[in-house]
């Protein structure tokens, strides 16, 4: 699934190394200083809405985490853009980063 139909839903403040440790290597990088996006993760996040739901009772959300018009891949702590098709994307990313929750499996690593 591509990132078509996603748009900015919020922000997460963290550093590049934290994102790599949680989500693996970026899906996309571009060293061009004139590129709008130099670094992006494209993730299909599986989540459960309520406690006690069965393992097969879950939803997925397409999430993107990216820098915007920085001219380089930011390594220090900064405000990363969070994209998605709904505002759940922002909630999920901030929950994962804030709780330092590592995925059992990461297709990007």
Located regions from the model:
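Amphipathic alpha-helical segments
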Residues: 8-31
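Short beta-strand-to-loop capping motifs
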Residues: 12, 45, 82-84
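Short, structured protein-protein interaction patches enriched in aromatics and acidic/basic residues
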Residues: 34-48, 58-61
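Intrinsically disordered, low-complexity Ser/Thr- and acidic-rich flexible linkers and loops
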Residues: 52-56
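Intrinsically disordered, low-complexity regulatory segments enriched in Ser/Thr/Pro
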Residues: 60-91
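Active-site or metal-binding loop neighborhoods of secreted/extracellular toxin and effector enzymes
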Residues: 94-109
């Amino acid at each position: 699934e591509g990132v078509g139909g996603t748009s900015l839903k919020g922000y997460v403040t963290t550093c590049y190394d934290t994102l790599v440790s949680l989500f693996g290597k970026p899906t996309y990088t571009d060293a061009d200083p004139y590129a709008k996006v130099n670094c992006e993760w494209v993730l299909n996040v599986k989540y459960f809405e309520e406690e006690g739901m069965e393992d097969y009772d879950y939803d997925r959300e397409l999430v993107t985490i990216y820098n915007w018009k920085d001219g380089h891949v930011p390594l220090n702590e900064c405000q990363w853009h969070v994209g998605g098709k709904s505002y759940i994307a922002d909630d999920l990313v901030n929950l994962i980063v804030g709780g330092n929750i590592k995925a059992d499996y990461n297709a990007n690593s």
